[in-house]
């Protein structure tokens, strides 16, 4: 990059701007790498939701995959209640997944001084 001089002979560009751009590009690359690693780790992070006093329990991973659903034997005869509890449980586990994903992402963005990215 060619340095430009003002009327007073002071530099108007060049070195500092180039360094800032290189530093920013490096930081952006590191941030993307950390985010990719985090996305990959989400398959290992589990969250659990229990509804109906424990009658339905759902376990899912933060990559939004359901791993297990446990249903109390007493619900076998009450289809409507079972359906309502499954819906409530799925909604709750999805909310917990999103909250956990935001918490994990926040840890990374704080390292880079980028609050509120997620």
Curated annotation (Swiss-Prot):
A Pfam family found in this protein is: YbaB_DNA_bd
Per UniProt, what is one GO molecular function of this protein?
Answer: DNA binding
**The keyword Cytoplasm appears for this protein:** yes
Q: Where in the cell is it found?
A: Cytoplasm, Nucleoid
Q: Which family does it belong to?
A: Belongs to the YbaB/EbfC family.
**Recorded GO CC terms:** bacterial nucleoid; cytosol
Where is this protein chiefly located? Answer: cytoplasm
Complexes and interactors: Homodimer.
The answer to whether the entry has keyword DNA-binding is yes
Q: Which domain of life is it from?
A: Bacteria
Q: What does this protein do?
A: Binds to DNA and alters its conformation. May be involved in regulation of gene expression, nucleoid organization and DNA protection.
Question: Which cysteine residues pair off into disulfide bonds?
Answer: none
For this protein, the record's InterPro entries field holds: YbaB-like_sf, YbaB/EbfC
UniProt entry keywords in alphabetical sequence: Cytoplasm, DNA-binding
This protein is called Nucleoid-associated protein Tpet_0244
NCBIfam families for this protein = DNA_YbaB_EbfC (TIGR00103)
């Amino acid at each position: 990059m060619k340095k430009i001089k003002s009327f007073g002979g002071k530099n108007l560009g060049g070195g500092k701007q180039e360094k800032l751009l290189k530093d920013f590009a490096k930081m952006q690359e590191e941030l993307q790498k950390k985010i990719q690693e985090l996305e990959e780790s989400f398959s290992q992070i589990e969250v659990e939701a229990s509804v109906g006093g424990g009658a339905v329990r759902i376990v899912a991973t933060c990559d939004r995959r359901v791993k297990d659903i446990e249903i109390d034997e007493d619900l076998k005869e009450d289809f409507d209640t079972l359906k309502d509890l499954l819906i409530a449980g799925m909604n709750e586990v999805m909310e917990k997944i999103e909250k956990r994903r935001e918490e994990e992402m926040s840890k990374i963005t704080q390292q880079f001084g980028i609050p509120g990215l997620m």
